[in-house]
């Protein structure tokens, strides 16, 4: 879907097609990945108002390998009218696994609740405690690499674009683009970016992004550090997979209100 498109060469301002018996020059894999990401960002911003999904993540935090977490997510993208935000970026999550955090609920609405998360603890101890936390506070970041403000496929797309633009022209970077992968039965294109030599300031050795061919949005990202010993396995830094994406389901303010009767937050809590 994304490869093999016709490239035109320019000479003196005129468009010239390759001769019939000539193969068009292959597109650089990194540039192809960026093109897909730009298309995805445009589609998300113009056509996707909100969505629900399942996020499965695994991270290394402060040198500790965390286990898999499975999270149900609702996201509503911001909406502006005449330069005024009429619908802020909004997130609701409920942890499904593991038992340590099962049932935990978190709500974040940009610009509301004093900029804080509303959190119901969940898990096996003090499950119904409801409190407020700054998204980047030590308590909120205790078991994760990123604040909830960076969750979602649009933020993942933006990160892909930022990383790709930084790698342009980097001779230490090798990129590959492979079609035919599947996540949860859905066809995806794989983008792999790898650094050949360890260097100062490199965030990873190898990163893999899977882009849903139909939705044109990234649904998986994983990054690995160099092996701890010569010839050893790459060390997982972070892994995020979005499945069961349901787009434009019509989420409302009630979906991001802790007093929603289907949520288990303390209803009398005032952030």
Model-derived features: where do they sit?
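Bacterial N-terminal signal peptides
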Residues: 2-13
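Boundary at the C-terminal end of the N-terminal hydrophobic targeting segment
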Residues: 19-21
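N-terminal mature ectodomain segment of secretory-pathway/periplasmic proteins
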Residues: 31-126
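Gly/Pro-enriched, hydrophobic low-complexity segments
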Residues: 60-62, 97-99, 107, 113-270
């Amino acid at each position: 879907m994304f490869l093999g498109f016709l490239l035109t060469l320019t000479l003196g301002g005129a468009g010239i097609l390759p001769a019939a018996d000539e193969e068009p020059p292959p597109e650089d894999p990194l540039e192809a990945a960026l093109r897909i990401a730009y298309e995805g960002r445009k589609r998300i911003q113009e056509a996707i108002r909100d969505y629900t999904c399942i996020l499965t993540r695994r991270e290394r935090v402060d040198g500790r390998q965390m286990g898999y977490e499975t999270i149900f997510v609702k996201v509503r993208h911001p909406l502006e009218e005449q330069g005024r935000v009429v619908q802020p970026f909004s997130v609701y999550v409920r942890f499904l696994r593991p038992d340590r955090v099962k049932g935990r609920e978190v709500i974040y609405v940009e610009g509301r609740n004093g900029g804080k998360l509303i959190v119901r603890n969940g898990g096996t101890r003090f499950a119904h405690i409801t409190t407020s936390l700054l998204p980047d506070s030590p308590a909120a970041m205790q078991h994760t690499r990123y604040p909830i403000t960076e969750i979602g496929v649009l933020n993942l797309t933006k990160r892909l674009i930022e990383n790709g633009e930084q790698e342009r022209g980097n001779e230490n970077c090798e990129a590959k683009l492979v079609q035919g992968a599947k996540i949860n039965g859905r066809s995806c294109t794989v983008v792999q970016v790898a650094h050949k030599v360890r260097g100062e300031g490199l965030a990873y050795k190898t990163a893999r992004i899977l882009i849903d061919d139909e939705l044109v949005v990234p649904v998986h990202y994983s990054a690995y550090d160099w092996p701890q010993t010569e010839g050893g396995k790459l060390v997982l830094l972070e892994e995020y997979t979005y499945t069961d994406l349901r787009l434009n389901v019509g989420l409302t303010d009630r979906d991001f209100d802790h007093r929603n009767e289907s949520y288990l937050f303390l209803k009398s809590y005032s952030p």
